[in-house]
């Protein structure tokens, strides 16, 4: 059996106001006595096939918050298909608009779906997450979508070997259902793929819009 591995998350600890850890392995060996302090926040990503681990963690007080999905592959579309939409790399002056979108539009994720985390904190986590790009602490490329010079969406990319990872993607509510997210991904693949051979992106099983988008682009469930 693998020994329990708890990895401290200083950034998330600051946001939550309590020690935060990621449980990396040794799920069936975990017990609350291993925590250096309490109360604390501990998250774990467990494969749905690891039934014993899931049951053990729930007995230790864990709750299932979401079920994550990963998609990968090459998009089957490359052209921007909507007139009136423009796409470019982000500028420093885009930070307020991008951060506002991040704070308001991410509702289906492990922070917002956790009833123990207040909405104001969940929103601040997403705001600060993308703000770290402007501080040079997160991501390699940030792209924005504009309509009539208004920033209406963004995509944060991380280059990881032969993949480019979609770290965050969001579109303002009143601009949704207009193909902006799809076009952002196509623009990124066409102009910022570098040596990447495929896209890797995660979402939640509750996010039907994202599942439809990635499937429509020809990405496959990992």
Question: Language-model segments: which ranges?
Answer:
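Conserved acetyl-CoA-binding loop-helix of GNAT-fold acetyltransferases
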Residues: 28-36, 168-171, 177-190, 212-216
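Active-site rim helix/loop that mediates acceptor-substrate recognition in acyltransferases
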Residues: 51-56, 118-143
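Conserved beta-hairpin
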Residues: 46, 138-159, 172
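Acyl-donor-binding surface of acyltransferase catalytic domains
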Residues: 24-93
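Conserved active-site alpha-helix within GNAT-family acetyltransferase domains
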Residues: 49-64, 178, 182, 205-222
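A short beta-loop-alpha structural element at the N-terminal edge
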Residues: 86-102, 106-109
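Conserved GNAT acetyl-CoA-binding A-motif
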Residues: 37-48, 163, 192-203
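A short, internal acetyl-CoA/4′-phosphopantetheine-binding micro-motif in the GNAT/acyltransferase core
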Residues: 18-28, 47-48, 169-177, 203-204
